[in-house]
Amino acid sequence: MEDDLNTLAPLGPAAWLFVCPRQDEWCDVLAALSLCDRSSSVAIAPLLVDLTVDRDFQVAVRTPISRYEGGVLTKVTSMWPAAFVFHNAEAIVSRTEDHGDVGGLCAEARARFGVASYRAEAERADTDFTELWAALGVDGARVVMYAVVGYGLKELLYAGQLVPCVEEARTVLLGAVEAFKLPLYPATLFADGDATADGAAAVGLRSRTPFVDRRGLYVSALSEALFYYVFTALGQALRFGHTEHLIDEGMKQFLQDTQNSVKLAPQKRYYGYLSQKLTPGERDQLLLCDAIACELAFSFASVYFDSAYEPAPLMNYSEWPLVRAAEGHADLLRRLSELKLHLSAHVGALVFSGNSVLYQTRIAFFSAANKVPAGGTAQDGLLKAVQFCNGLTCLTEDALNDACRTVKFEGPGGGGGGRDEQFTPQHLAWACATSPHLMSDLVWYLNRLAIYNTGQNGGSALYEHLVHCAVNLCPACRGRCCQSCYQTAFVRIQTRLPPLPKQLKREPFVLTLFSRFLCDVDVLGTFGKRYAGDAKEPSAASLAAAPGEARKVGDEAGLGAGGGGPGGRLGVNVDRLKYFNQILDYCKRNSLIDPSTGEDTLAVRGRADFMSALSGLNRCVDEAAMALVSEVRMKSNRDEVAGATQAFNLDLNPYAVAFSPLLAHQYYRAFFLIVQNLALVSASSYVVDNPLTVSSLSRWLLQHFQSICGAFASNSARKGLLFTKDAKCSKSVEFERFMDFALYAASGRHVLLSTETKLCKLSVCMLRTCRVKNRPIPRGGKGLPVSVFFKRDVVQRRNPVRGCLAFLLYAFHERLFPGCGLSCLDFWQKVYHNALPKSVAIGKMEEFNAFVKYVLNVTTEYNEHDLIDVPPSNLLSYVEYRFHNKFLCFYGFGDYLSTLHGLSTKLVPQNHLNFPHLLAASPKFASVAEYVLYFKKLKLDGVPPPHVATFSRESLVRSVFENRSLVTVAFGIEKYSTSGGSREVFHFGQIGYFAGNGVERSLNVNSMGGGDYRYMRQRFVLATRLVDLLLRRSRRETVLFDADLLRTRVLAALESHDTQLDPELAAIAEIMDGRGGEPPEYEDVLFFVDGQECLAASIVGKIKELIKKGVEDFSLTALGADAGAGGGPAGSAGGPESGGGAGAAGGEGTYDLSALFLDVENECVVLEGPTAAALDGGGDGDECAFPAKRLRL
């Protein structure tokens, strides 16, 4: 059902001027959330209710744009998600961190890379607000003024063609602050005469009447901030460098409806072509695709954003939990700073990923991919050949113009002769559209990100830089603020910066968006999942008549068909979750899992309880898996299972990230990249059928652009990736009280009249979501085997303490082996290697043997079927993994799955030394030793440690979406055509990887461990849960950071086969080496032990005990001696009082446990109950074949 446009977008102004009293606390909050730089007198604040706008503020309106005889024409637009503070912004800017001469850095980047610079209108002075202040009765020195503007009117604000109407000022509340807001009307409403063809032609940057010159809102500093933050950024996304022409055409597009005309191509230049080896035909095709993508994205940005959106829940500042929970103003500022620390992890991913959306500004032709597939068309080959990629290496190349002639680059190092070798501050400034506001904000985040040391420099590079700054030799700030300037920030994170690509690569792109709640991200995703529309199974006749139409591709009620093929509907006959819910019901009845939180509630008093509870649970899981196999064989087929798809949605509402102007900037970059990727579908069709035969690209576009626009409008949305919705106007003509604009322009008299209003366009299209998918079950190409990364040729034998029961063995170690005296890891290491000393109390030998054999059998059986290759961390994940592993193996699948993982941000304390921004003033240290001593004194004085955002793995990835998270994800846009006569092209977002070693340590590949391809099978979503905050490797150069090396040593220690050595003590010795007795954070230990939560908790607990005992020497020798003297294995572990069994009371040597392992080595599967009976068919065939034989009937 379509929404009513009259309700979504009421009549009213689409630009407002706010006049707010200067209040310290209000300015403090804005300083924390806004984009500011000391070089600019403008601040860019977030668009938030009760902070910058009032509660009655409308984010979508039908705004008057011109007059006709007897009435006013209106058009729908939505607000740009930011407020631009231009008067007394120093009250905000002065409260922010100084980052050096960022304005100078941006100017250097413009000169170096040929970016257009802002040119103020020399003949025009800034608006004098004296009369306005007098009319409002305010003191201009005591107020802050800012503008909020609609997407369609942003060009008018830049050009000073919005007229404030003080007569219509109204008083509003911004939280507890009382302010004024005045409407800003477009200059076209005050033009001489009604709207005519002649009057329309007068629209432009320099087309103003004397009235607008006199009364229009024009502030040069505001126009300059808009020039870079808004328009240069849009131009970069479109690969268009003539910024003033872009602004001029954007103004005409909104006021004159020129969406279907060619606007940018005559002035466009094409970079990155001369360094590609292309045939003339390939070059022409690429040029045309480039031009079409640029024009379509520019046109349809107006279609999508001059639309009617609803405000996002995140926009209500006063309802943020962190605001409501704040105990005073200082606590509020601390919480806002913590919010930004969470965001820093996402900002870091955008900066450190070589495939970040900030760098994807080049369009390239991959000739090797331009092959027509069997049964395909030339368009299919072109779709695969034309791709977007990293554009940092072509910034100084010569270009081609509209006539395909070479235009020399005018900057230094032009023509490609000065290719950069490494990422510099100028490259980041370019990626920020050379906006000082954006660049300065990024520096704030870079100053608070963790340092990744490589072992070659350690932290010494930072310390030496800061000592060097003592003589005022810092190039960024000349010694003014070396503790926080951009040069110091780059020295801190130098090892994490992305390398400049040496060759073109087709890669997924990294972006940050708000996630939607609806997702299908469990092991098999959409397969066998019933939705609201699937309450009744479709008849056989309906399936036969329209197998692919049972659910529309874009149905928001479900993320896809039950199976994964193009038709993919048979799988919906199967209700997979019915069987999984039976398992959950069993867990609830037996008090194994808390039904509300999902946490473990299993109570174990001893080994018998443990085996009984686990046997019953395993029996229930296996029976459910077998029942699902039976149903699938009756109602579905193997292809439907193989086509399972995991999917989740990203919110494309522009206000979903309105709380951060930096993320709002990135949102528009992401939008333009997505839309241009989809534009290539329409482009490829016309380019293949209509080769370039005219003298210029713009002439070709003039011939075909209207047809291309129509094709794009029909095939861009609801084809698998992008989803939109429409809203229509129920009545096109209304009467509203507007002032007499002509009289106001002529005499200044303000008279309200009942005016007829007509809406120019009766329907609008709104962006909803972008869908990202992953196929968990790998498939090779046609006739090709599955990739080696997914091949499961060998089933690894695992120590139980590293297997599926590890979380239980750690949790109940003291109850299973009371008085043992060994840590859980050390105990099972010795058991597994048949080296358990007789001095260890194990109870009765027969019970002990039975228990160990049971644990070994369950672990081995699980490993035989483990296709997920991710150790469970609790009972909920254990039953989910076991259920799906069993089902897939019983059904004949034997290769590893591709898995989705969620990593959520956490704030952890760090060493003061690595965060010089803690210094109150620019450092004046004579040596590194003096620097180190100063920071040690800070710590002793009680200065709180700085915190950084790090990631921890979620046990279930769906919790990322259920907790309404901000997510950073990498995905590519895949396109494929149907095989029928319609030849429709569909597309989907395929989740990918982050390019670069500095993004997040959990994503890095340890090159020292060959043959383990888990990193190629795992895909990650980086997330920050906003609930409780704002809502109730292609082969790459590998850099080994110190943390990676330490992790390798810790894992090697834990894997040691030396039974005379406690593995946990060996790990502790590695972790504590060089720390000076300082305990590590739990999250760091969790990283070192490869995410094994139970083991990490055990190690952290043991370290705390050792420190509490006063241990200062953490060498392995000292720790071993301390353990022996303190009642370790050789001490108090034995003895009748602790339940020691045979030989435990002072025996020597080791227990002989070899008999426990004989059966395990000869058995493949150990099942219980009906499942075991079902599989007990004899014979030497593959165990996965037994269910097939049993179920053929």
Swiss-Prot record:
Keywords, A to Z, come to:
DNA replication, DNA-binding, Host nucleus
Q: Which HAMAP family match?
A: HSV_DNBI
What Gene Ontology cellular-component terms does the record carry? Answer: host cell nucleus
Stated family: Belongs to the herpesviridae major DNA-binding protein family.
* Ranges in coiled-coil conformation: none
Q: Which SUPFAM superfamilies match?
A: Viral ssDNA binding protein
Assembly and interaction partners: Homooligomers. Forms double-helical filaments necessary for the formation of replication compartments within the host nucleus. Interacts with the origin-binding protein. Interacts with the helicase primase complex; this interaction stimulates primer synthesis activity of the helicase-primase complex. Interacts with the DNA polymerase. Interacts with the alkaline exonuclease; this interaction increases its nuclease processivity.
Instruction: Name the Pfam families for this protein.
Output: Viral_DNA_bp
At the top level of its lineage, which domain of life is listed? Answer: Viruses
Tell me one GO molecular function of this protein: single-stranded DNA binding
Motif Required for filament formation boundaries? 827-828
InterPro entries linked to this entry: DBP_sf (IPR035989), Viral_ssDBP_head (IPR043031), Viral_ssDNA-bd (IPR000635)
Cellular compartment(s): Host nucleus
Q: What does this protein do?
A: Plays several crucial roles in viral infection. Participates in the opening of the viral DNA origin to initiate replication by interacting with the origin-binding protein. May disrupt loops, hairpins and other secondary structures present on ssDNA to reduce and eliminate pausing of viral DNA polymerase at specific sites during elongation. Promotes viral DNA recombination by performing strand-transfer, characterized by the ability to transfer a DNA strand from a linear duplex to a complementary single-stranded DNA circle. Can also catalyze the renaturation of complementary single strands.
Q: Which organism is it from?
A: Tupaiid herpesvirus (strain 2)
Q: Where is this region: Required for nuclear localization?
A: 1170-1193
What are the BP-aspect GO terms?
DNA replication
Protein name as it appears in the record: Major DNA-binding protein
Q: Where is this region: Disordered?
A: 1125-1145
